[in-house]
Amino acid sequence: MEQLAKLLLWQLLLQQSSVVYLYSVPADASNPDSVVVSVLNISATRGSQAVLPCKSYRMVWTQDRLNDRQRVVHWDVYSTYYGDNKMERLCDMYSAGNQRVYSSYNQGRILMPQNAFTDGNFSLVIKDVAESDAGVYSCNLHHHYCHLYETVKIQLDITKKAKAAKEYWDGEKAVIVALEGSTVMLPCVNRNHIWTERHSEEEQQVVHWDRQPPGVPHDRADRLIDLYASGERRSYGPLFIRQKMNITDTAFALGDFSLRISELENADEGTYSCHLHHHYCGLHERRIYQVFVTEPVREKKVVNLTTHNTAPAIDPNVVRGHNVINVIIPESRIHFFQQLGYVLATLLLFVVLLIIVVFITRKRRQRGYEYNVKKYGEKDVNLKEFTVDTTDLTQYKSEDIRLDYKNNILKEKAEQARSFPAKNIDLDKDFRKEYCK
């Protein structure tokens, strides 16, 4: 009975786990060392289409029709023996072809192992070394398909003494001191699987898209799509998610693995990640995208819909509403500032006109005051009322004023001043003359 109960319990647990992971496929954690190369924030309006860019030309897959001529090794030497100080290509070899020696002098003197791309040993053998062979040699490995380039440098010195022959490391490169006339081997060994064996590349290239809802950690992200270079595609989740999130069929041909999300909704917010795995080339990259959904901006318009005059006759048995529909939407800020500018300009013009009117009024009032003063002097002042009393002058005339003068001229002038002849002065006549002028 206990064993039967345990079996039933295990069956229930298995059923629960299958139900839980039916719509939530966890992300692949087999490559925790994926390098995060970019983090982007993407905002899109609700109802639109969002494109999460994920491109890598190192992931472009092309069928190798040249028997894998994309791997090559070549040896170069930098020599100062002839004083020209130049780099010279010695030999090269493709993974599917024979090695090629560039100089006729080196034919039969230098060579690499024929099984170099199988064994991973790319060492260069030089027979009957001479002083002209001294220099800095470089072993260059190129993988054009994976965009990998590796270089190993070795310095070769020639000596005529057997005791001086040795090998050591100078901190940057290996140094070999070889006896003149002997055979020397410059080591270059790389047994990485990229250089030694050929994999089925389309089975080792895969792209994953994962999604993390807000608050969900990376290790519990949901898998959306798996896409292999062979053309196999796996989509996860409900049908509506598989229909709205997709990658183009030419992804591996163009290196464009961008995810397109159609008809965005608020539930589509979260963290998306694009995982690029090229196991053959050792490429493991991850790109992260923070997706935010915003509300669309509505255009503000004023729409007036009116019916035409040629409407059919109104049926009295049918209750109808109004024929005019007015839809008023708040105006934009630009229109508000335009109206405000018109109002301010009108007020400014009114103030200028008011200032001009006040100035003219004050001028007219000043002219009126001057006119009243002249008129008042003409009407109210009667010069006849003023009389000149000359009785007092006779007193000064009769008086005998004796003054001491320095000469006769001053005395005569003083006597003339004391004599005031009687004269009648008509003041009214003189004032009238002045006024008429």
From Swiss-Prot:
Glycosylated residues in this chain: 41, 121, 246, 304
SUPFAM superfamilies: Immunoglobulin (SSF48726)
Disulfide bonds: 54-139, 188-274
Intracellular or extracellular location(s): Cell membrane
Main location: membrane
Membrane association type: Single-pass type I membrane protein
Signal peptide range: 1-22
Transmembrane regions listed in the UniProt entry: 340-360
GO biological process, one term: cell differentiation
Pfam families per the UniProt record, alphabetical: V-set (PF07686)
Membrane side Extracellular: residue ranges: 23-339
GO cellular component, one term: cell surface
Entry-linked InterPro entries: Ig-like_dom, Ig-like_dom_sf, Ig-like_fold, Ig_sub, Ig_V-set, MXRA8
Every Ig-like V-type domain range: 32-159, 167-294
Topological domains annotated Cytoplasmic: 361-437
Assigned keywords, A-Z: Cell adhesion, Cell membrane, Disulfide bond, Glycoprotein, Immunoglobulin domain, Membrane, Repeat, Signal, Transmembrane, Transmembrane helix
Role: Transmembrane protein which can modulate activity of various signaling pathways, probably via binding to integrin ITGAV:ITGB3. Mediates heterophilic cell-cell interactions in vitro.
Subunit text: Homodimer in cis. Does not appear to form trans-homodimers.
PANTHER family: MATRIX REMODELING-ASSOCIATED PROTEIN 8
The protein's name: Matrix remodeling-associated protein 8
Gene designation per UniProt: MXRA8
